[in-house]
């Protein structure tokens, strides 16, 4: 007599539930993926910042580009990559209008993408070790590069700018005298096109240690 073979009904229901979890082969959110050599290099790449629409990626890099300049030292430069319609990031390229023989890094964009805030270090127009600068995008070219001034910058290190969504408040890190720790978070407010005297965010935010990258 032939013995009937069957799968217990509870196993069948369990298989159905597991099958619901199998959606696609696209890695789920939360999985860390290396962005590959279109973004990364053999040098240090860090300080990423996205545009408000998440379609532009700014970052700082110490990569060594091919150069025929004698005794050219490796420094920090700003790079940018754009997200295409297929969800692929373009090959990052140097922001030539911004980069100089000095160190540039830690950038952020305004909501409309037309104003760039970044830090530049050890330059003749710097008040301190590193200062905050701005640049304007006109006809697809970054121009009107200027120091944000003594109201914002100090005689020490000022870097890591981060703009509020409203675009009127700029947060940044500084190790200037008078802080609560080694480096603190400060802010400045734009009123009628001018940045006000920067202020410390206070002991609720800052500690006796380092606060950076707001």
Question: Where is each model-derived feature located?
Answer:
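Short, conserved micro-motifs composed of acidic
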Residues: 2-214
């Amino acid at each position: 007599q032939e013995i009937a073979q069957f799968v217990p009904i509870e196993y069948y229901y369990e298989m159905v539930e597991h099958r619901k979890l199998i959606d696609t082969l696209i890695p789920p959110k939360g999985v860390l993926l290396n962005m590959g050599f279109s973004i990364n290099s053999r040098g240090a790449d860090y300080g990423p910042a996205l545009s408000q629409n998440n379609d532009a990626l700014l970052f700082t890099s110490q990569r060594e580009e091919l150069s025929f300049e004698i005794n050219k030292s490796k420094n920090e430069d700003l790079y940018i990559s754009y997200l295409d319609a297929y969800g692929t990031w373009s090959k990052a390229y140097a922001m030539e209008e911004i980069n100089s023989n000095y160190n540039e890094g830690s950038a952020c964009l305004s909501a409309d993408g037309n104003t760039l805030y970044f830090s530049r270090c050890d330059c003749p127009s710097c008040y301190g070790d590193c200062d905050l600068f701005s640049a304007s995008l006109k006809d697809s070219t970054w121009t009107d590069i200027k120091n944000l001034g003594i109201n914002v910058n100090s005689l020490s290190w000022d870097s890591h700018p981060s703009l509020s969504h409203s675009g009127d408040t700029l947060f940044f890190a500084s190790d200037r005298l008078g802080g609560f720790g080694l480096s603190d978070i400060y802010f400045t407010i734009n009123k009628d096109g001018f940045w006000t005297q920067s202020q410390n965010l206070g002991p609720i935010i800052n500690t006796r240690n380092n606060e950076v990258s707001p």
